């Protein structure tokens, strides 16, 4: 724009200068032509009237004719003749001689503005897409507020995914075909009278390593199909019996008491891949969840595509686990490479010892991995066995309850028929008033049956809550290292959704504790011993310590004797000795209180250790509150 403005200003200046030059030349020409020398004849103005034009006959006076005269032909030429004609001076209009011509109009301003706007918008949009691919926070902002931002980011993420995984589309044809004839059949399964919600909650309270509704949606779809079939069969049966009721109104058996208390859901379970930090995995999970949501909107499609969706869900979860394991292996390999690179720059005297320690650490890591793999295998087998036993026991209990309810219903029907017969016989004698008493008795029996069903359901929920709390405690007690217990805690929260005490206990736990796990007692003791050495060194330093003071503190901390465990002093050494004894006794609360009495650098150095102990104590206290609440619910049910 600046360049075009400079050119336009230069054009204006040149046009004005040219106009002034032409005016000056014309004036000088007039002056030279108006001069008369003594040898020249006098210019005489014509006296005859001058016509305005050859075609018009009107005349004008001589005063209105321009005084421009021609040069006399007798003038002597002072320069050699030239073949180049001199430039003709521009003829100036008397009315507009002093007004400069208008400046040329600027053309293409709107086109340039539109071009720059498009280029700037394209560069900004491309930069936004690039930043959204790199930053999660900007990704959320860009896809939510920028038009077509989500489609653009999704397009580039898909291209990146297919570039990194070119063989990802090979597994698309592994799903078995679904026969339409089987999906259109209406069958009543053997367990159609049971509620699907109880089985799902019980599967959530078990082990996380086994297969269940949290890993596949097949069972949920089967239960949903069975419940829909039962509902449809009952509706057809009711339509067939409707004409008969109009003709002869007879008391029908109470079959409505056996219908499920909770209607089966028509939506499929969404995919939840744990530890899916990769954006590609997150995008695939989001797309698959959108597909599930669309399928769940249609009841027929939800039951039809339940099996393929469950298989795809299992594949996605296995892919997420593989990505997590690959990333962990890559981090471990990178860490080992860094340690080896640092080991090369150490002193030559320590090189042999470091190599020996590295080899020993590698062997220990290998043995530890083998031990962990074997322990995990045994734990998985044991959990599968326990889960199988629990499932069998639950099935037996439910079948027993179902049989008892059926027997009670049959007995009630038999009694009802007998009472009806007796009333019909007594009706002849004029005792129709007994019918109201019989109806009241039947209502009382129905109410009693309903109350017992509620008591049984409450008892089952209480038992499931107790099992879920025990699962959380077993994860914390049996873990050899810090292990997350998010799924167990989610199971407890789902089972105790209506209990404010359990919800408050779960909310009091620090999210870092159940996301990353809490350290075990042995880890706390080992870390305390390392922290105690640093605290002893810091306790010998004055406030303005120098290099000599640090060296003296290091030497004195090596030769300093430990005090007896029964000391009552408030110095750093006494506090450390008492804390170590309390940790060996298993009293973490008292040990944390002892370490909290330290002051200065000693307390600053032990701050992280105190934070870990505080998280462990908070988790244990929350578990105790949840166990107490579960026992209280059991007592309420029994009372």
From Swiss-Prot:
Residue interval of the organelle targeting sequence: 1-38
Q: Which residues form a coiled coil?
A: 309-447
Task: Give the UniProt record's GO annotations in the biological process aspect.
Answer: cristae formation
Q: Give the highest taxon in the source lineage.
A: Eukaryota
Provide the transmembrane region boundaries: 113-133
What is the topology of this protein in the membrane according to its UniProt annotation? Single-pass membrane protein
The UniProt regions of compositional bias labelled Pro residues, in chain numbering, are 83-92
* Side Mitochondrial intermembrane, residues: 134-639
Which residues does the entry place in the Mitochondrial matrix compartment?
39-112
Q: Disordered: where is this region?
A: 34-106, 168-264
InterPro entries attached to this UniProt entry: MIC60
Annotated Low complexity bias: 61-82
Q: Which UniProt keywords apply?
A: Coiled coil, Membrane, Mitochondrion, Mitochondrion inner membrane, Transit peptide, Transmembrane, Transmembrane helix
Q: Where is the composition biased (Polar residues)?
A: 205-224
Q: Which GO terms describe its cellular component?
A: MICOS complex
Residue stretches of biased makeup (Basic and acidic residues): 232-248
* Subcellular localization(s) per the UniProt record: Mitochondrion inner membrane
Could you give the subunit structure recorded for this chain?
Component of the mitochondrial contact site and cristae organizing system (MICOS) complex.
PANTHER family listed in its UniProt record: MICOS COMPLEX SUBUNIT MIC60, MITOFILIN
The family classification in the record reads: Belongs to the MICOS complex subunit Mic60 family.
Its biological purpose: Component of the MICOS complex, a large protein complex of the mitochondrial inner membrane that plays crucial roles in the maintenance of crista junctions, inner membrane architecture, and formation of contact sites to the outer membrane. Plays a role in keeping cristae membranes connected to the inner boundary membrane. Also promotes protein import via the mitochondrial intermembrane space assembly (MIA) pathway.
Q: What is this protein called?
A: MICOS complex subunit MIC60
Source species of the chain: Talaromyces stipitatus (strain ATCC 10500 / CBS 375.48 / QM 6759 / NRRL 1006) (Penicillium stipitatum)
Lineage here is: Eukaryota, Fungi, Dikarya, Ascomycota, Pezizomycotina
The gene it comes from is MIC60
